Amino acid sequence: MQHRAATDFWQQYHALSPEVRARADKQFSLLKANSQHPSLQFKKVGERHGQEIWSARVTLNHRALAIRRDDGYLWFWIGDHKAYESLIS
């Protein structure tokens, strides 16, 4: 599966602290190697407009969201857990 990131994702990514960005890079590498790794908690969290929404853990307090597509995942959001909760509810 391919993983791509939307422009908004990159803007949010660059607004994160250097420590969180480094962890996001590590988790993304892990995701590409083994999407079932327990530290990722990679899972479907909902559906909007007929598209599956998937989540991956970045840190204890940060998550990333993607839309599942035929050819892989489009990552559209990364941020803190509080904002994540409001996005998926």
Please place each PLM-identified region on the residue numbering.
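A periodicity- and composition-biased signal for non-globular, repetitive helical segments
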Residues: Q27-S29, A33, P38, R63, ...
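Enriched for short, Lys/Arg-rich terminal
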Residues: Q2-T7, Q11, A15, Q51, ...
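A short, surface-exposed loop/turn module that caps and links secondary-structure elements
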Residues: L30-A56
